Amino acid sequence: MTALKQTEKSTSLPMSFDFDIEGMTCASCVRRVEKAIAAVPGVASANVNLATERATVQFNGVPETTSVLRAVEKAGYAPRIVTEEIQIEGMTCASCVSRVEKALKAVPGVADASVNLATEKATVRLVSGSAEISALAAAVKGAGYGIRKATPAEAMKEDVDHRTAELRSLKSAVTISSLMTLPLFLLEMGSHFIPGVHDFIMGTIGMRNNLYLQFALATLVLFGPGLRFFRKGVPNLLRWTPDMNSLVVLGTTAAWGYSVVTTFVPAILPSGTANVYYEAAAVIVTLILVGRYLESRAKGRTSQAIKRLVGLQPKTAFVLHSGEFVETEITEVVTGDVIRIRPGEKIPVDGTVTDGSSYVDESMITGEPVPVQKATDSAVIGGTINKTGSITFKATKVGSDTLLAQIIRLVEAAQGSKLPIQALVDRVTAWFVPVVILAALLTFAAWYVLGPSPALSFALVNAVAVLIIACPCAMGLATPTSIMVGTGRAAELGILFRKGEALQSLRDADVVAVDKTGTLTKGRPELTDLVAAEGFEPDEVLCLVASLETLSEHPIAEAIVSAAKSRGIATVAVSAFEATPGFGVSGTVSGRRVLVGADRALVKNGIDITGFADEAERLGSGGKSPLYAAIDGRLAAIVAVSDPVKESTPQAIKSLHALGLKVAMVTGDNRRTAEAIAKKLGIDEVVAEVLPEGKVDAVRKLRQGGRSVAFIGDGINDAPALAEADVGIAVGTGTDIAIESADVVLMSGDLNGVAKALALSKATIRNIKQNLFWAFVYNISLVPVAAGVLYPVNGTLLSPIFAAAAMAMSSVFVLGNALRLKSFDPA
């Protein structure tokens, strides 16, 4: 993913700009950043994800990336700045340095660039996530110089380093805060747990010194470890855009400030209200810091799937140079390099085997546990593991072009997307924090006016509890964390969700429509029958038909040509070849006009096929696909091919039925053949004799009655139907997959992956609903309790300390629930 790219082929369509943001803590932050970005002229849309801490901005017209970054900073947040070191090739003088620096600084998202001629390195400071090496490389190449490509591991290392530093900082803050809060808590509340503590304090340091000591400890906690809340919360308050940090600041400052007045000028307070709440302020900060620490740890675990994918690629490869295999940095491997792989080693890049044979474990890519045999001309995938033999292969795709790199980009894109279910959360969080502040003010006023004596103390404590217990974080994390873990688990199972939205739409599917050839079947048909008409010799017909089919790319053509070769029948030259999709092929072979195709092709050309009606019925009833051959305008033969059903297909259909789905087969075969196959497999509906362009109409027909349709095909020939369906699922294997043609991609050819994807979709949406239910119920129920609605009933009041603990744990609960998807088992 480059920093700036067109979302479609047309240059008039919106451009996209991605970057990482620091400082967001809750759903209100997300709303605020999105609002700030959307206000920038030229911005078409802004999508900010709290879990990934990433923004995706689309522009209409000329992109104003600098204005977007300034808007984010003005809103109180910081685009994350990272440093990249890249090797520049071809520089010879200071002018080269200036030229390269200028080119790099022009890349959207680059804050600064410094180039060193002596080391031939460029140090680039850029907004994290906004520009990858590919974008920088394009700029340098445009200036006339070369650049060494980076690996995805480098970008991941930056993210890991950032999270490690954040965890270290939070751990330190929790430790310091706890060490100061514990004695403070004992000074104020110790007598409730340990008899004699109060008398001991009175007899040693006295009440006045006790208050001074509490003041000192609470102040150190608030403006030491707790300073992070003030740095973010106060500016947002001043901008009238409060967030969760603002709620913490208001609550703790109110408790601390009231206590300061009690300590130093108690005379100004009403009689009986001179109480201190230092321990509440300190414990609130400490508990929320603990929650942040646990939350940060959990967030790191949600992205482990991406880290594992990045970690699949080795750092070096043994490349053939001058007759010897030399260990080479992976960044220096180029297309065409010959690479040696020994048993147990990881395959570094995509390629084609040139020598040797082995079995390769591709489970980390396809989800299939059985090793795949590789021999000369076999394709190998970067990141997979060589098991037994030694092989040599030629690199065909390297760097960001490898299948592994594509998978990583797809998973990242899916994890950063928003589901339709998120819309409600966005609407609520837009006003959540301001409403909580208003609720706290109303709580204070109600208790001050209507509460028992001392009214001021009751008013303060309950208002602080309301401010502290409200948790927009849980609402903001509810959806994106489940998406992150769910799509990550899907990748481990060999399932790629190209769009996060497909997680929700797939769950709603009623009918699964399956293309027969290559999906239900192996896609490798075999010639089973050839019955010649009177006056024609079978071998003569096969020679003419096979010769014609050598120019066709259809799988059936390959079956006919292969059968001719196995019988020792040589093919001859063809002229005037013509292929009509859905009908057949025609041409001139040895001076004779030959036509091969479905019954409709011959009927269209006025050729009577009734002479083979009985044969056609027999072959079709056996699940074979009959074709006809005409020579010089006469019916010459009926040919039958059979495409074996995949071993996994029957179980896959049973699994889909078990999930409550109807299964429909869409095929170009005649109805008799299609129904025979459907009956054998237990398929519910059949749409037969469909031309390639008719698959879209077939999907529309299946959708009648308000049904949601998922269409499964090979992702290339079925592209229009995949696009028309509510969910398009492409089934492929390895590098043959057409990733861009569907919403969901199954990396293996096993149709059981569809049932796994559906089950995971249902589990993920269920997990999201659980999170949202918790987040909303938590806030709807506990905010009124914190305000004191139960006090008139049974005298219950919620301490600000318990409010802080509940708030801290609410986000951890959401993250913990989302992490359960890591162990999802579709079996």
From Swiss-Prot:
State what protein this is by name.
Copper-transporting P-type ATPase
Q: Which InterPro entries match?
A: ATPase_P-typ_cyto_dom_N (IPR023299), ATPase_P-typ_P_site (IPR018303), ATPase_P-typ_TM_dom_sf (IPR023298), ATPase_P-typ_transduc_dom_A_sf (IPR008250), HAD-like_sf (IPR036412), HAD_sf (IPR023214), Heavy-metal-associated_CS (IPR017969), HMA_Cu_ion-bd (IPR006122)
What membrane topology was assigned to this protein in its record?
Multi-pass membrane protein
Q: What is its EC number?
A: 7.2.2.9
Where's it found, cell-wise? Cell membrane
Which GO BP terms sit in this record? copper ion homeostasis
Task performed by this protein:
Involved in copper efflux.
Per its record, the protein catalyses:
Cu(2+)(in) + ATP + H2O = Cu(2+)(out) + ADP + phosphate + H(+)
Binding of Mg(2+) occurs at 714, 718
Q: Which GO terms describe its cellular component?
A: plasma membrane
Annotated residues for binding of Cu cation 1: 26, 29
Query: Has UniProt tagged this entry with the keyword rRNA processing?
Result: no
Q: Which organism is it from?
A: Sinorhizobium medicae (strain WSM419) (Ensifer medicae)
